[in-house]
Swiss-Prot record:
Species assigned in the record: Cardioderma cor
Compartments, as annotated in UniProt: Mitochondrion inner membrane
InterPro entries in UniProt: Complex_I_Subunit_2, NADH_DH_su2_C, NADH_UbQ_OxRdtase_chain2, ND/Mrp_TM
Protein name: NADH-ubiquinone oxidoreductase chain 2
Bilayer topology term: Multi-pass membrane protein
GO cellular component: mitochondrial inner membrane
Family under the similarity heading: Belongs to the complex I subunit 2 family.
Length: 347
């Protein structure tokens, strides 16, 4: 990509997200969403192949539909209340439509259909941007409007998202699809606690971005996109392969790794609000995600993955890409659990 075009695209993506996060006026929020969407499409189409074009088209159509629903909610609220303020979403119909629009942008179930397909069709770096940075703007709007959200609708979508994220990841061999379904499940965990304790949503988002970014960077350093390629990365970089497997278990929420921390605190907060059935159901469905991560760990580290005899193997003689940020990211992605006593004081 042309360096000048890359600078312009990167600046527009960052600026669009910052405008959404810093604005209290609905028109500026909508403009920020559009800037961000139009700038990220060239990033998704960087490969110039039919699969990438198809993924970018699916992303564009989904995000455009969500933006249309968001504008419908804003205009409906304006007609009833006369307010353009983000925090002043008082009309129930407008609040419901806005929740559906932001759920579509985030990839919450039942609007999750685009996330695995788009992530699978783009390069690893584009998938990293799609599953981390692109979640910031919709979640910031949900955070600002959390007191006026439709609670029952949000809880239903969050619970189904955790279930879909667990079931969808089973029997997957493509690493990008596995991370896409993991993203759907994590979005469910973030939104289910949003109306009870928004601070926990921010904590979960921070740890999710750390773990997902670290996993994608390790995949890029190993040039791994499938389970088979990941199992052969032991020859090339044993330390990186071990780190991938530990971080994947952390993504699944296995104690005592970092990924267990937000799930533990969310279940605790839901229990404090006299909700027993919901956290029990969420914990049981989280076992699905943990299962396919543990199965992936087993198939790539404890056994030899099935492969043909004439397949090219990776060796340490090959040059590995230098990623100086990986070391601190790996530490934060796996060893954040001791911070739990400090974080438990958050209100």
């Amino acid at each position: 990509m042309n360096p000048l075009a890359l600078i312009m695209i990167t600046t527009t993506i960052i600026l669009g997200t910052v405008i959404v996060m810093m604005s209290s006026h609905w028109l500026l929020v909508w403009i920020g969403f559009e800037m961000n969407m139009l700038a990220v499409i060239p990033v998704l189409m960087k490969r110039h192949n039919p699969r990438a074009v198809e993924a970018a088209t699916k992303y564009f159509l989904t995000q455009a539909t969500a933006s249309m629903l968001l504008m419908l909610a804003v205009v409906t609220n304006l007609l009833y209340s006369g307010q353009w303020t983000v925090a002043n979403m008082t009309n129930p119909l407008a609040s419901t439509v806005m929740t559906l629009a932001l759920a579509m942008k985030l990839g919450l179930s039942p609007f999750h259909f685009w996330v695995p397909e788009v992530t699978q069709g783009v390069p690893l770096l584009s998938g990293l941007i799609l599953l981390t940075w692109q979640k910031l703007a919709p979640l910031s709007v949900l955070y600002q409007t959390s007191p006026s959200l439709n609670l029952n609708l949000l809880l239903a979508m969050a619970t189904v998202s955790v279930a879909v994220g667990g079931w969808g990841g089973l029997n997957q061999t493509q690493l990008r699809k596995i991370l896409a379904y993991s993203s759907i499940a994590h979005m469910g965990w973030m939104t289910i606690i949003l109306t009870y304790n928004p601070t926990l949503t921010l904590l979960n988002l921070l740890l999710y971005i750390l773990m997902t970014a670290t996993t994608f960077m390790l995949f890029m350093s190993n040039s791994s996109t499938t389970t088979l390629m990941l199992s052969h990365s032991w020859n090339k970089s044993p330390v990186a392969a071990t780190s991938v497997l530990i971080i994947m278990l952390s993504l699944g929420g296995l104690p005592p790794l970092s990924g267990f921390l937000p799930k533990w605190m969310i279940i605790q907060e839901l229990t404090k609000n006299e909700s027993i059935f919901l956290p029990t159901l969420m914990a049981m469905m989280a076992l699905l995600s943990l299962y396919f991560y543990m199965r992936l760990t087993y198939s790539t580290s404890l056994t030899l993955f099935p492969s043909t005899n004439n397949m090219k193997m990776k060796w340490q003689l090959e040059d590995t890409k230098r990623t100086p940020l990986l070391s601190p990211l790996i530490v934060m992605s796996t060893l954040a659990l001791p911070l739990a006593p400090i974080l438990s004081t958050l209100n």
